[in-house]
Design a protein with these regions (language model features):
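Active-site-adjacent loop and "lid" segments of alpha/beta metabolic enzymes
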Residues: 2-13, 18-21, 27, 42-61, ...
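Hydrophobic "anchor" residues on beta-strands that sit immediately upstream
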Residues: 33, 70, 111, 131, ...
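Hydrophobic residues within beta-strands of alpha/beta enzymes
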Residues: 65, 73, 133, 201, ...
Length: 297
């Protein structure tokens, strides 16, 4: 268990993200991030957006998510499922940039996040209208990422993962307490992040990334221990193996379980839920917040 006092945190508590154009994303109350996958091999087939020159399917799905209450749309062009195909930066950009430009033109006030571990893709994405960079590798797969984000001055989602999407399933052995290792990992990364000039950071413990379902359940149970770091926490649980595998189900059958685990994440301090099913997640946030209202600052 983590015993560190609040005075020992790396950052002062910060629950508002400053996005390009001076727009503020307020995470004092939990928010929902909707997933839009541009990949043909994402683990949940219904999350895959059809590839179209006019982006009709993408814009329709985005509008549905925003109307349902999504605060952020997270656009991904590189599949991070276990064993996913590795694609080049050029192909990732080719998938990403036209779709991102279409989203920004259609929804100028929406908060748009781009899921990438490549600094070159992040730079092009911000130029095309992205507000947030969501990096599954925490800067480990591209040493230029931190300096790039610091220069771009955009919020950064720092995730924990070992290995790569292709090898992470082989890296589930933790020499010591897993959650303690995660806190140490984040602390070390945050030192480098501060040195790079990055101000706004969200922590993602990486459910399912180099973690077995049992380890992910332990992490969820102890998610509140990450609050010693003083930063908002993102929970990405939606339809993952830790939801459906213990139940003998498929990702397509995992919505009820996702709702249950999202509620647990909220009760343990999560401020951002990354989900495929926005309406259900928004209702979960509303009901948990109604039952357990946040203290007035």
């Amino acid at each position: 268990m983590i015993q560190t006092a609040a005075k020992d945190t790396c950052f002062s508590p910060r629950q508002t993200l400053c996005c390009p154009g001076g727009r503020l994303l307020d995470l004092r109350q939990p928010q929902v991030m909707g997933i839009l996958n541009l990949t043909p091999d994402s683990f949940f087939a219904d999350s895959r957006v059809a590839s179209q020159a006019n982006h009709t399917d993408l814009l329709r799905r985005a509008e549905t998510m925003l109307k349902a209450g999504a605060a952020v749309l997270d656009l991904g062009a590189y599949s991070s499922r276990p064993g996913a195909e590795d694609i080049s930066a050029a192909e990732e950009q080719q998938r990403m940039l036209p779709a991102l430009q279409a989203l920004r033109a259609a929804f100028p006030e929406a908060f748009l996040s781009v899921d990438t571990f490549r600094a070159s893709v992040a730079e092009e994405a911000v130029a095309a209208g992205a507000d947030i960079i969501n990096d599954i590798s925490g800067g480990t797969l591209d040493e230029a990422m931190f300096a790039t984000i610091g220069r771009l001055r955009v919020p950064y989602v720092l995730m924990h993962m070992r290995g790569t999407p292709q090898t992470m399933a082989q890296h589930t052995d933790y020499a010591t307490d897993m959650v303690v290792e995660l806190v140490r990992y984040f602390r070390d990364k945050l030192v480098a992040i501060r040195a790079a000039g990055i101000v706004d950071v969200v922590l993602d413990p990486g459910f399912g990334f180099a973690k077995t379902p049992a380890q992910s359940h332990e992490l969820l149970r102890r998610l509140g221990e990450l609050q010693v770091l003083g930063l908002p926490v993102l929970a990405g649980l939606s339809r993952k193996g830790l939801v459906y595998k213990p139940l003998g189900l498929t990702p397509e059958e995992a919505l009820p379980g996702t709702i249950a685990l999202n509620a647990i994440a909220l009760l343990n301090g999560a401020k951002l839920l990354r989900v495929h099913d926005v309406a259900e997640a928004v209702q979960t946030v509303q009901l948990v917040s109604q039952t357990y209202p946040a203290p007035t600052p």
